[in-house]
Amino acid sequence: MTRAFYFDVGSPYVYLTVSRLALDDVEWKPISLGGLWKLSGGGSWALTDRREAGMAEIEARAERYGLPPIRWPDAWPGHYLGAMRACLVAAESGVLEDFARNALRIGFAEGRDLSQPDAVWHAALRSGLDPVSVNERIAAPELKQRLIDETQAAYDRGVRGVPTLADGERLLRGDDAIDPPR
């Protein structure tokens, strides 16, 4: 069975993971974290009184991992459906991993809001995609449905958050589970 890496570009934990790991031996699977929460009844800690502590913990992990400081987008967390649909467009063009890595750098190393079209455009350009074509494709009903279907399939497999690495029946969730600190 192929190893699968489930992700959403709005997650700083995904940023921590892809910034330090090659992940070139896995199938990248874009899903909607918000969609997972809707299915499971969960929600983001970033919208609770744990926000500041959670952000500080992520910043400390980035420093511990030797990564550049996190630059939080002003509107984080936001609505990343457009960015996640753009991931599906990138997959159709064979540049999903490159697009996702660029989007995550734009969001968490440059502090740009991935819920805004211009940030997605920059990720598309850096990945060799035509941003106008990407913008047109992300509005397609079949692409919207595909993201819903991929998210449902991930949920059915037991995925409850991102990042998650599925290796056969084994699910590793979180940057620290996928590559435990030594």
Tell what function each PLM region has.
Residues 9-107:
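Structural alpha/beta surface segment adjacent to cysteine/selenocysteine redox centers
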